[in-house]
Regions:
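Glycosyltransferase-associated regions of secretory-pathway enzymes
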Residues: 1-51, 68-149
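Small-residue hinge/turn detector
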Residues: 51-63
Length: 149
């Protein structure tokens, strides 16, 4: 399924698509030693590391992050690609949660203040903690960064 999703992103994208793995991400960013050590020791999940990578890449380079499990059925609209910041908002049905900004597709220009603040909050959190406080943690920090800016 993941390969089908990746193929759909390549098919419908009019911009270069960079597929990341543990090795290729090192060409673009260097994670701090304490974060890498926390991850390799098992005190940080793959999802948490992915969030730090996502925010770091977007803050530095800008662009569009699409999770590997997103199946595109058409081109990404220009209004998304031309935005300084774009994220989908979702009320999650009846779930009581103040975080409504999703992270599975994010777009930003380089050095976007919302992405930068979310990145800084995520790194500060993981430097001091060893487990995620809530499944929607990343949505929460995106919501906070968005509301503050």
């Amino acid at each position: 399924m993941v390969q089908k999703c990746i193929k759909s992103v390549v098919e419908f994208s009019e911009r270069p698509v960079i597929k990341l793995d543990a090795k290729s991400v090192e060409k673009y960013i260097q994670l701090p030693n304490d974060i890498r050590q926390k991850y390799t020791s098992g005190k940080m999940s793959d999802a948490a590391l992915s969030d730090l990578i996502r925010f770091s890449l977007l803050e530095h380079f800008g662009g569009t992050w699409i999770d590997a499990t997103v199946l595109l059925t058409g081109k990404i609209p220009e209004y998304i690609l031309e935005s300084d910041f774009f994220a989908f908002r979702d009320t999650f049905g009846l779930i009581e949660n103040p975080a409504t900004i999703s992270n599975w597709l994010l777009h930003s220009v380089p050095h976007n203040i919302i992405i930068k603040e979310a990145k800084n909050m995520a790194f500060a959190y993981w430097r001091n903690e060893e487990y995620v406080v809530d499944y929607l943690f990343t949505y929460m920090i995106l919501q906070i960064a968005y509301e503050r800016n």
